[in-house]
Amino acid sequence: MNILKSLISVGIMTLISRIFGFFRDVLIAHIFGASMFTDAFFIAFKIPNLLRRIFAEGAFYQSFIPILIDYKSRKDKEYIQEFIRSTCGFTILVLTTFVILGIIFSDYIIFISAPGFSESSKKLQLASNLLKIMFPYILFISLSSLCSSILNSYNYFFIPSLSSSLLNISIIVFSFFFSDYFEPSIISLAWSVMIGGFFQLFYQFPHLYKIKMLVFPKINFKNIGLIKVLKKMGPSTLGSCANQISLIFNTIFSSLLHSGSISWIYYADRLIEFPIGIIGVSLSTILFTSFSCSYSNNTQSEYKILLNWGIRFGLILSLPISVILFMFSKPLVIILFQYGKFTDFDVLMTQKALELYSFGLVSFILVKILVSAFYSCQEVNIPMRISILTLFLTQLMNPFLIFYFQHSGLALSCSIASWINFFLLYWKLYQKGIINFKLNDFIFIFRLLIAVLVMTFFLIFMLYFIPSWKIGSFFDKIIRLFTILSISGIVYLIALHFLGIRLLNYSDKLFQKK
């Protein structure tokens, strides 16, 4: 498998999905602004999203793929199909029960997730109604993730990465054409989420059929593969839950702050998730499969090479982007969100949160790579323990940081906790002898920092000649921003070249060793 080719393919599709996602958020900001209605929607939407990250993209994904890849190399097709049938049947049974309970107890879930909503019965009831509509999304997206995991295991990365765009397209279509048919109109977004999840699932069926892995679900708790997945899912779920519980606590804190805080954090989070999705998710998705193959084939040298390549490539891409996000936080918020009911005050509040999120971007991305390295060799306890520790530290920091920074203190605590998470994971890999920090690694980081510094000085110089970002049409601003960032990217690449970091040669070395 050509890792760089797969990475580019997934990265491009993720970029397209994120562009749709930004267009979606621009529409929401334009139509609804930062109001009681958006706060209610974002809280309700966050709950199935948190569950998606735990069940679909977290514990299940990390436990299922290594076992499936191991079976691919040792078992016949019928054995693998039986494993998939049993896994699918178990997933449907558990999550259908979960969805029914979630709909029944939606009022209590909202009250626990956002206690600040209790001051407004209308806000609480609206969020509860939205949650009832969206709860089935967790079933659709979890089954979609199962399909994606199977396709990824067979080195089909393009199709699963495209499916994420379908949710954004659904929300865009409903915002444009159906919002006037609902009262209040924010309910249209809830229906768009559920329908988008439906299409994300069924879109992948023809591609599963092509590889003869489209099978009918079956309830079989005795399947050996399923039992292995469930055993691994215990610690994996705790690790995933720790991260998501931290987000729930952040939501609770933000619900107690100034009205609009939830929306400001959401919009800043959307901006920081853009590079995390394109770089972090793409890298970890591709590398996770490669790590699992290396572990299954017992080729530790290849495993170490892949991990070193992933960390270095992640640093090369994430460091300059973190600087750009910090320096261009205000222009990005203005260009993408300041329309309709989104005010100057909303821009300022979102900007503050984004600036503090940007400090953690590098660690957000590197943590995904390191966690993939652990899970691929079926080591789930270490990431779980570190996740629980960082959850505890984050919630210790939150009250103090909120006192000084209000809602943006939540962004800062996430960034600090992510760096702690990264260093602890790195240290554990170092103790295991998987990572060895050598002199050439120090030289690499030093050269990389110089290249980023050169780009930063160039950006500072360019900012002196840039007119106010409030001047010009949307497309004028986009062209202006794209031009500046493109030139800055070229400056960065030239600096890397002169400092001896040549991306093409660097990638070629990886494939030669593979």
Swiss-Prot record:
CDD domains for this protein: MATE_MurJ_like (cd13123)
A molecular-function term among this protein's GO annotations: lipid-linked peptidoglycan transporter activity
Gene Ontology CC annotations of this record: plasma membrane
Signal peptide extent: none
Membrane topology: Multi-pass membrane protein
Record keywords: Cell inner membrane, Cell membrane, Cell shape, Cell wall biogenesis/degradation, Membrane, Peptidoglycan synthesis, Transmembrane, Transmembrane helix, Transport
Homology family: Belongs to the MurJ/MviN family.
Task of the protein: Involved in peptidoglycan biosynthesis. Transports lipid-linked peptidoglycan precursors from the inner to the outer leaflet of the cytoplasmic membrane.
NCBIfam families: murJ_mviN
Descriptive protein name: Probable lipid II flippase MurJ
